[in-house]
């Protein structure tokens, strides 16, 4: 492996982004060997990562939104090599990047390649990996049904608008949750199982989550009496509903839902009647800012 070889896996819609081009050029002028590959269709990111690992690249950069980040991170983790991950946030929500303190400006984001990569955890459910968060209930439906065109026009506000227009479809989910020293059963409106802290365009469902603690943060919003009003508050920023959440921090969690539960894994839908969530500690090395809110402690000095 050549420690200086870096490959940017860039979402196809960002191929003409002039800020990205300038940031890449600046890295090259500074002496970094930085190549770029562009995705075109589903599966491209995974294939590009696999080819990059075989070619000896030391670092992969995920250039896109949360979905691109999940694809690259999963492929990198399954490759079981020593290559690290850097993040170039170019999506609508950029939930993981925002919570981690990663700059949204391309040049500043790529500058994090100079930071020492830190080992972080990944979440896993029924054989699928996720970097940020699994969401369930009405919030996951909003994320899944927000159109790309609307996100392009409104940015993160698109999730709010989609939620407001789908109030007529609001109904509670039913589930049983089991984990070490934690049991809960009932109807719920929203669910977050977080390695990271926020999802759905800035909704902070797991405010104390860390990506290097070997735990998943569980946040359940039980169905309130004023369901529509509470949901409106949640979609509008969440102020005033904090005290309603049931929370836990666990190494694993089993969820049973007799009618099935729709879950969103960083943009990828999953449905099941029985889901088991667990943590893969230190599964991936990621270039994060010094003092990132998602890290427990500073890196050890060598």
From Swiss-Prot:
EC numbers for this chain: 2.7.1.-
Protein origin, superkingdom: Bacteria
InterPro entries, sorted: ATP-NAD_kinase_N, Diacylglycerol/lipid_kinase, Diacylglycerol_kinase_cat_dom, Lip_kinase_YegS, Lipid_Phosphate_FormReg, NAD/diacylglycerol_kinase_sf, YegS/DAGK_C
Example of a GO MF term: lipid kinase activity
Keyword terms, alphabetized: ATP-binding, Cytoplasm, Kinase, Lipid biosynthesis, Lipid metabolism, Magnesium, Metal-binding, Nucleotide-binding, Phospholipid biosynthesis, Phospholipid metabolism, Transferase
List of catalytic residues: 268 (proton acceptor)
Protein family per UniProt: Belongs to the diacylglycerol/lipid kinase family. YegS lipid kinase subfamily.
Residues that coordinate or bind Mg(2+): 210, 213, 215
Cofactor notes: Binds 1 Mg(2+) ion per subunit. Ca(2+) may be able to substitute.
Source organism of this protein record: Pseudomonas aeruginosa (strain ATCC 15692 / DSM 22644 / CIP 104116 / JCM 14847 / LMG 12228 / 1C / PRS 101 / PAO1)
Main location: cytoplasm
Keyword Hydrolase attributed: no
Cofactors (names): Mg(2+); Ca(2+)
Ligand binding (ATP): 39, 65-71, 92
Cell compartment(s), UniProt: Cytoplasm
Database matches in PROSITE patterns: DAGK
The protein's name: Probable lipid kinase YegS-like
Location of the DAGKc domain: 1-129
Keyword match Metal-binding: yes
Biological-process GO terms, alphabetical: phospholipid biosynthetic process
Gene Ontology, cellular component aspect: cytoplasm
Role according to the record: Probably phosphorylates lipids; the in vivo substrate is unknown.
